[in-house]
């Protein structure tokens, strides 16, 4: 009887610890991501027309979809393997950020989010990607 009780207590404790650590992953990602004022004020020089969205989508599929998912929900095939939670880019919290903030975060990266300034060296292409990220909310 005592063995069963001890086994049950250990299993409940393990389950509690697992849930606690799963929640910690979400907490880790909640850190603020400061964006320099220069970028916050930066305007997107690329019009969000069909050509820009097509180019942005192509870049999205190549570089972003595996983590952020097809629709930007943070549910890509690699998302679960990351240390931090991938944000849902369609939420008002994210979409209220400026285009310049999107540009900065895409270019510079942090933690699990890689920098794309070498993989996507043309600024116009990053702006096309920003336009596509904006379209995910529609």
Residues covered by each model-derived region:
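Sequence context surrounding c-type heme c attachment/ligation sites in exported
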Residues: 53-61, 80, 96-100, 110, ...
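Signal peptide cleavage region of secreted peptide precursors
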Residues: 20-27
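Periplasmic/extracellular electron-transfer cofactor-ligation site
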Residues: 31-34, 51, 61-84, 112-115, ...
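C-terminal capping alpha-helices of c-type cytochrome domains
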Residues: 105-111, 118-138
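Electron-transfer interface patches adjacent to heme c in soluble/periplasmic c-type cytochromes
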Residues: 85-100, 116-126
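Bacterial N-terminal signal peptides
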Residues: 10-19
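Positively charged n-region of N-terminal signal peptides that target proteins for export
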Residues: 1-4
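Electrostatic cytochrome c docking/interface patches
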Residues: 29-59
């Amino acid at each position: 009887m005592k063995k069963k009780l001890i086994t049950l207590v250990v299993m409940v404790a393990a389950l509690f610890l697992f849930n606690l650590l799963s929640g910690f992953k979400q907490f880790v990602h909640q850190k603020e991501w400061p964006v320099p004022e220069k970028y916050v004020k930066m305007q997107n020089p690329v019009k969000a027309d069909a050509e820009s969205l097509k180019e942005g989508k192509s870049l999205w599929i190549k570089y972003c979809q595996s983590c952020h998912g097809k629709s930007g929900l943070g549910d890509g095939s690699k998302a679960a393997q990351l240390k931090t939670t991938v944000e849902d880019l369609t939420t008002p919290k994210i979409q209220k950020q400026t285009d310049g903030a999107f540009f900065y975060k895409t270019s510079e990266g942090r933690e699990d989010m890689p920098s794309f300034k070498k993989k996507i060296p043309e600024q116009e292409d990053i702006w096309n990607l920003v336009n596509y990220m904006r379209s995910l909310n529609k």
